[in-house]
Amino acid sequence: MALTIVLILFSVLALIIGLLLSRTSPSGGLSSLNGQDLEIFKKTKDRGWIKGLQVFMFLLTIVMILIIIFYRVS
């Protein structure tokens, strides 16, 4: 039950960050999740909070995937 709540909170947080980044630049937000190149680690004009939020959203997504994999294995 606690794991479900954690995953829901992480998903909502990632969605909010993605929506905040959607309008900031063509390389950010949810547009990078639809099969195009993920431009987090490429040189772009994004600096400061935008780049930090992009990296945080990417890491949050990886953490959620790992939690689901470990939960299914055990």
UniProtKB/Swiss-Prot annotation:
Transmembrane intervals: 1-21, 50-70
Signal peptide (residue range): none
InterPro entries (UniProt xref): SecG
Domain of life of the source: Bacteria
Cell location: Cell membrane
Membrane topology of this protein: Multi-pass membrane protein
Disulfide cross-links: none
Entry's Gene Ontology cellular component terms: plasma membrane
Molecular-function annotations in GO: protein-transporting ATPase activity
Record flagged with keyword Protein transport: yes
Keywords carried by this UniProt record: Cell membrane, Membrane, Protein transport, Translocation, Transmembrane, Transmembrane helix, Transport
GO biological process: protein secretion
Family: Belongs to the SecG family.
Function text: Involved in protein export. Participates in an early event of protein translocation.
Protein name: Probable protein-export membrane protein SecG
Source species of the chain: Ureaplasma parvum serovar 3 (strain ATCC 700970)
